[in-house]
Swiss-Prot record:
This is Fluoride-specific ion channel FluC. GO terms for biological process: cellular detoxification of fluoride. The gene is fluC. Fluoride-specific ion channel. Important for reducing fluoride concentration in the cell, thus reducing its toxicity. Na(+) is not transported, but it plays an essential structural role and its presence is essential for fluoride channel function.
């Protein structure tokens, strides 16, 4: 039961943070491209690498911390389904260049962000 509580608490915080990032990116860049989803997926990719190293090295692979931060917080913060919907919405505008760029950039930079998070985690912890 405690795992469920950790996941729920982390998920609640992650969901609110995701909402705020969406609001901020629309205010900064407008609604033309899904910068909110793009941003949370890159930030989340970096953080999953960082948190994985931190938990493994500093917290003796704590299952509780993993449930709170990775499953809960990052699970609520990032979302693959929003990424897919944003991609289809861009494609339905009739120009396939933007959705192709969005998918390629999200995957490419996302993988890079995980590597960066792992490297920073190894350096810090």
């Amino acid at each position: 039961m405690k795992d469920v509580i950790y996941v729920a608490l982390g998920g609640a915080v992650g969901s609110v943070l995701r909402y705020w990032v969406g609001i901020v990116t629309i205010r900064l860049f407008g609604p033309f491209l899904p910068w909110g989803t793009f941003s949370v997926n890159l930030i989340g990719s970096f953080c999953i690498g960082l948190f994985a190293e931190m938990i493994a090295r500093k917290f003796d692979a704590s299952a509780d911390l993993r449930m709170l931060l990775i499953t809960g917080l990052l699970g609520g913060f990032t979302t693959f389904s929003a990424f897919m919907l944003d991609t289809v919405s861009l494609a339905e505008r009739g120009d396939l260049l933007w959705p192709a760029f969005y998918v390629a950039a999200s995957i490419g930079f996302g993988v890079g962000a995980v590597f960066a998070g792992l490297a920073v985690g190894r350096w810090l912890f």
